[in-house]
């Protein structure tokens, strides 16, 4: 006995959905949108699709629809813009599973129906074979069809999802795929769908095909009679033959069509567009494959209705191909001296970075090849990565294109969307090439570390083809569908964190790290660039508003905490705005911004940099921290009280720093006698290590040497000079290991009033990154083992 089931129903207009056949539908009616919106939240996306009898009815009832439909699996739901900005329509893609008989609408929900599954039948196999042979005269063709249907079942896993008797599955697939090809009305297709018996279904398919063939034959026979149209046709033919002798057939037909329109007085904007495109193809050296593709699409465009969606989509595709640069090339400036001059003009500081950039580009300019690794500028926000890339483009006379990759999670953003999708377009790479209008621009791939993966694919994987010099001469965009040569493009990437760059991309990159600016560099940047830009934006000149070096330094120290200069620029803009208000309100004509004026306009200070203590106490030592905004002093406090030998860690210390504290204590215990500490003392006391600033998480191993020193100082009562700071990872054997952030730590220590720094010996090679004027004012002592520090401080 048939089983009645329930499902949501989607009523479609002008289309019959067959089982086993993929389909694509646009959903825009309010009732239908509601169904699809609810379906998006479900794991299994199935519903019944049925055709509406009368397309004009907006809210069809049970009698307005055919009662045989198809149970479908929805594979994809895409949001598309609605008819107005307040609505969202949908495009759905899926495939039919099995025919169903719709019994009634649900009483509780008009969008829900009761249905029964319909199975096909075979009454006479001889009839089935006879009809199949009418369509496919060769027996081998039928055998291949049956084998293909069986493979389709296996690949699509149909047998597990569709309740069809075993012997009928292949015949069902063949008949419904044939039915989908019938170029006929929906009523005839619906009749085919409703037919249960396979032989009868095949007969209807053949009949539908013959009817179309009959119309064509009837039309041909009617042309045998001489008519005025025939006479006109003969006249046109003679006229063209006089004008053209041995032209190609397609040109002959176009001329014929043009003269027909002249005879009846019709002019077409589309004709003008087509003529313009053909002229453009003739006059420009487009690649042959692209010319061929455009001409093919142009033929579709000519034959389509101007008001149809297909016409618009085809024209958009043609325009995309035409507007892409295929041969246009700008002339590069290969003068390395000009490159150095431009970088120095636009960027204060960053000497090592600029040196590496010049070395990297000098080779490429000499060889005229982009075969090396891609340059990737890595550094904190605001240190000038993007502006460096722009300066390189300026120096080389290259067109500059910036593509932001932050938050990109869909591979189609890089490769483009396939033309079958509504609203499809090329990916960001080819859209950037269209903006550049040349084949050799400079592409900035900004924030390459911010890409993410999702079920829409892996954009980082798509970028591999873009950046790999062995592959990018044949880059494939899903929308364009033709190979595009990116080998002449110079790519530069930027990132904030090197560890977030996908490994496969990292392997293809030349990493150039940008560190934070020093205070003096920030002052120079403000004087040479930021203040000038802020004054120009406010229509002021340097005579009306001036900034002293002390004022800029005060803003940097007490109102910003950043590696770059973005916040500094915002604060300068704020001062400028407040000055303009004062100028209009109080009649001020000019002003020099000093420290007092900064306090007046920016109010109370926001930050305080950590300064060394003025008085030394046992158990207090200056460590050195490296932060995303630069560096800072890291005071470490150790005290001990009577207890049971426990180690207490406070100050929001993370795992690595906690381990470092345990290693430091272990080293002190193992060498207690050497440090003049009674070993038995450790069992009688609890040691508390505290790092002030509990609201800020602290991590890393580089405070090891400072932790050992603070523990020894606390247990022996010996004080450490507050003008001393130290950094270095400690081991249980007392080795002082290399650390990072030498430049930032050294600058922050100097700013905090430190005069002597203990640093791992292997970090000496990084000291050239620190400004010479700071190094000259510090006593930097390089150590291999902790004993070197102990002998200097406590012996």
UniProtKB/Swiss-Prot annotation:
Q: Note whether Coiled coil occurs among the keywords.
A: no
Q: What GO molecular functions are on record for this protein? A: ATP binding; ATP hydrolysis activity; ATP-dependent peptidase activity; sequence-specific DNA binding; serine-type endopeptidase activity
InterPro entries given in the database record:
AAA+_ATPase (IPR003593), ATPase_AAA_core (IPR003959), Lon_bac (IPR027543), Lon_bac/euk-typ (IPR004815), Lon_lid (IPR054594), Lon_proteolytic (IPR008269), Lon_Prtase (IPR027065), Lon_prtase_N (IPR003111)
The entry's localization annotation reads: Cytoplasm
List, in alphabetical order, the GO biological process terms annotated in this UniProt record.
Answer: cellular response to heat; protein quality control for misfolded or incompletely synthesized proteins
> What reactions does this protein catalyze?
Hydrolysis of proteins in presence of ATP
Q: What is its main location?
A: cytoplasm
Signal peptide range equals none
- Please list the residues that bind ATP: 379-386
What's an example GO cellular component term for this entry? cytoplasm
Function noted in UniProt = ATP-dependent serine protease that mediates the selective degradation of mutant and abnormal proteins as well as certain short-lived regulatory proteins. Required for cellular homeostasis and for survival from DNA damage and developmental changes induced by stress. Degrades polypeptides processively to yield small peptide fragments that are 5 to 10 amino acids long. Binds to DNA in a double-stranded, site-specific manner.
Protein name as annotated: Lon protease
Please tell me the species this chain comes from. Mycoplasma genitalium (strain ATCC 33530 / DSM 19775 / NCTC 10195 / G37) (Mycoplasmoides genitalium)
């Amino acid at each position: 006995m048939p089983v009645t089931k329930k499902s949501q129903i989607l009523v479609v207009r002008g289309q019959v959905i067959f089982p086993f056949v993929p389909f694509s539908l646009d959903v825009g009616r309010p009732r239908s949108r509601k169904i699809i919106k609810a379906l998006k939240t479900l794991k299994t996306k199935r519903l019944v699709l049925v055709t509406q009898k009368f397309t004009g009815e907006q809210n069809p009832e049970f009698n307005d629809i055919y009662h045989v439909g198809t149970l479908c699996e929805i594979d994809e739901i895409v949001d598309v813009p609605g008819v107005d900005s307040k609505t969202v329509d949908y495009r759905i893609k899926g495939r039919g599973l099995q025919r169903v008989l719709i019994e009634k609408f649900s009483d509780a929900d008009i969008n829900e129906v009761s249905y029964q599954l319909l199975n096909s039948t075979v009454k006479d196999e001889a009839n089935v074979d006879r009809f199949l042979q009418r369509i496919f005269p060769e027996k081998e063709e039928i055998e291949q069809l049956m084998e293909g249907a069986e493979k389709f079942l296996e690949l699509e896993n149909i047998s597990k999802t569709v309740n069809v008797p075993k012997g009928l599955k292949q015949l069902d697939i063949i008949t419904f795929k044939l039915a989908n090809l019938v170029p006929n009305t929906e009523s005839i297709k619906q009749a085919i769908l409703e037919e249960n018996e396979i032989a009868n279904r095949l007969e209807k398919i053949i009949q539908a095909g013959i009817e179309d063939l009959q119309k064509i034959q009837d039309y041909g026979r009617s042309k045998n009679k001489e008519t005025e149209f025939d006479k006109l046709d003969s006249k046109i033919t003679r006229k063209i033959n006089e004008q053209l002798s041995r032209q190609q057939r397609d040109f002959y037909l176009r001329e014929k069509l043009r003269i027909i329109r002249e005879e009846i007085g019709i002019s077409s904007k589309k004709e003008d567009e087509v003529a313009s495109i053909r002229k453009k193809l003739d006059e420009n050296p487009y690649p042959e494959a692209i010319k061929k593709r455009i001409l093919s699409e142009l033929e579709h465009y000519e034959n389509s209705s101007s008001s149809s969606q297909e016409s618009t989509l085809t024209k958009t595709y043609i325009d995309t191909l035409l507007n892409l640069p295929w041969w246009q090339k700008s002339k590069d400036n290969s003068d390395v001296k000009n490159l150095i001059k431009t970088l120095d003009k636009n960027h204060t500081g960053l000497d090592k970075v600029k040196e590496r950039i010049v070395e990297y580009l000098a080779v490429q300019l000499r060889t005229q090849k982009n075969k090396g690794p891609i340059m990737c500028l890595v550094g904190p926000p605001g240190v000038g990565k993007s502006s460096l890339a722009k300066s390189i483009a300026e120096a080389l006379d290259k067109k500059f294109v910036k593509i932001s990759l932050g938050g990109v999670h869909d591979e189609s953003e890089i490769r483009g969307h396939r033309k079958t999708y509504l609203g499809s377009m090329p990916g960001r790479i080819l859209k950037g090439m269209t903006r550049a209008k040349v084949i050799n621009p400079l592409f900035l791939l900004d924030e390459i570390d911010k890409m993410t993966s999702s079920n829409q694919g892996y954009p980082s994987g798509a970028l591999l083809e873009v950046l790999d010099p062995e592959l990018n001469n044949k880059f494939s965009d899903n929308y364009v569908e033709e190979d595009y040569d990116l080998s002449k493009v110079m790519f530069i990437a930027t990132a904030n964190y090197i560890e977030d760059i996908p490994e496969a991309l990292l392997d293809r990159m030349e990493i150039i790290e940008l560190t934070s600016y020093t205070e003096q560099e920030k002052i120079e940047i403000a004087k040479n660039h930021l203040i000038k830009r802020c004054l120009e934006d406010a229509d002021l000149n340097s005579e009306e508003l001036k900034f002293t070096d002390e004022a800029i330094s005060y803003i940097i120290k007490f109102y910003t905490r950043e590696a770059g200069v973005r916040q500094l620029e915002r604060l300068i803009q704020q001062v400028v705005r407040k000055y303009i208000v004062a100028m209009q309100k109080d009649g001020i004509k000019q002003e020099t911004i000093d420290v007092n004026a900064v306090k007046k306009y920016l109010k109370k200070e926001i930050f305080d940099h950590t300064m060394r203590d003025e008085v030394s106490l046992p158990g207090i030592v200056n460590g050195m921290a490296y932060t995303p905004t630069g560096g800072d002093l890291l005071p470490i406090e150790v005290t001990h009280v009577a207890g049971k030998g426990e180690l207490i860690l406070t100050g929001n210390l993370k795992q690595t720093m906690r381990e470092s504290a345990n290693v430091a204590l272990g080293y002190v215990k193992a060498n207690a006698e050497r440090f003049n500490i009674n070993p038995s003392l450790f069992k009688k006391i609890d040691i508390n290590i505290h790092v002030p600033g509990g609201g800020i998480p602290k991590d890393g191993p580089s405070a090891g040497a400072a932790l050992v020193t603070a523990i020894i100082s606390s247990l022996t009562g010996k004080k450490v000079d507050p003008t001393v700071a130290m950094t270095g990872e400690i081991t249980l054997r007392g080795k002082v290991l290399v650390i990072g952030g030498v430049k930032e730590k050294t600058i922050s220590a100097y700013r905090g009033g430190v005069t002597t720094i203990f640093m791992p010996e292997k970090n000496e090679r990084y000291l050239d990154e620190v400004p010479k004027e700071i190094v000259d004012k510090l006593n930097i002592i390089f150590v291999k083992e902790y004993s070197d520090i102990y002998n200097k401080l406590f012996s």
